[in-house]
Regions:
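Terminal targeting signals and extreme-terminal segments of soluble enzymes
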Residues: 1-291
């Protein structure tokens, strides 16, 4: 039995079916649609496999156009937009059952030295991940035991996720909450040594909790949901090399939610406080009661 980290690496190992055309698996899940982070991660793998491997990705911009169907393979068609002296650009279209469900543009850059460097420090000091409970442990503590569906999900989860602030369970607790969240994350097992796999694994993870910041002032993160939500777009900037199987802090905030959409921004740091990745995403929120 492979562990969830090995299954993630396998999920990101696309089948090359033609020049610049790849096929990715879409596991059978109980979810209504394919997880967006999976599609983004696989699309970035497809883009990266058409480069020389000497230029790491420095940015991506993507749109989620239609929900993907679990259990149905996804085909990734790569367009070689540019191969310059310093930059490489790829455009990827994800197709499922003849329909475009996602597109992504990624830019790869040959590392250069500019002679200067700076970054803002993390916004706050947080406990180390070893001091914090896992999400599953927090839910077990609150409910006494994990519901069977959540237990299955926890066993399949490729990332260990630990919220910096304890989960809130009632509307009274979230009444004065700021639209901010922070989590420690790392893959639950080794991911190998291919930098592209680590980049694409973190891309997968970046879609897991980012919209939490939008929801925190509205409803408890765990428990019955009042809203259906879906990622609309996703943008990432990769600043420094990293390993997704080592702890990273994902600091998230939502500057605005209006018109049925919420904007979330994320900053990903290593344990020493170095900024690794910046993320921005907009999500769609609709009331489940139809109001």
């Amino acid at each position: 039995m492979t562990n969830p980290a090995e299954r993630l690496v396998d999920l990101l190992d696309l089948e090359r079916i033609e020049v610049d055309i790849f096929r990715g698996r879409s596991p059978e899940e109980s979810l209504q649609r394919v997880f967006g982070g999976q599609v983004a991660g696989q699309a970035l793998v497809a883009a990266g496999r058409t480069t020389d491997g000497e230029r790491p990705v420095h940015s991506l911009h993507a749109y989620f156009l239609r929900p993907g169907r679990p259990g149905v393979p996804i085909v990734y068609q790569v367009e070689r937009v540019r191969d310059g002296r310093s930059f490489t650009t790829r455009r990827v279209t994800a197709v499922q059952e003849g329909r475009t469900i996602f597109n992504l543009t990624a830019s790869f850059h040959r590392p250069e030295e500019a002679g200067f460097e700076h970054q803002l420090p993390p916004a706050r000091t947080v406990p180390d991940p070893e001091e914090l409970p896992t999400v599953a442990d927090e839910v077990r503590e609150h409910l006494g035991a994990l519901p069977e569906a959540l237990e299955r999900m926890a066993r399949r989860q490729p990332f260990d996720i630990r919220y910096v602030d304890r989960l809130r369970w009632t509307h009274e607790e979230i009444k004065d909450a700021d639209p901010r969240s922070a989590v420690w994350m790392r893959a639950v097992g080794p991911l190998g040594d291919d930098p592209l796999v680590h980049t694409c694994a973190l891309t997968y993870a970046s879609d897991m909790t980012l919209l939490d910041a939008v929801r925190i002032p509205v409803e408890p993160l765990w428990g019955p949901r009042g809203f259906d939500m879906a990622s609309l777009d996703h943008a990432m900037w990769f600043h420094r090399p990293f390993r997704a199987d080592e702890w990273f802090l994902y600091d998230q905030e939502s500057p605005i939610a209006t018109g049925g959409r919420g904007l979330a921004r994320g900053r990903i740091y290593d344990r020493s406080g170095q900024l690794l990745v910046s993320v921005v995403q907009e999500g769609l929120f609709r009331r489940l009661d139809g109001r």
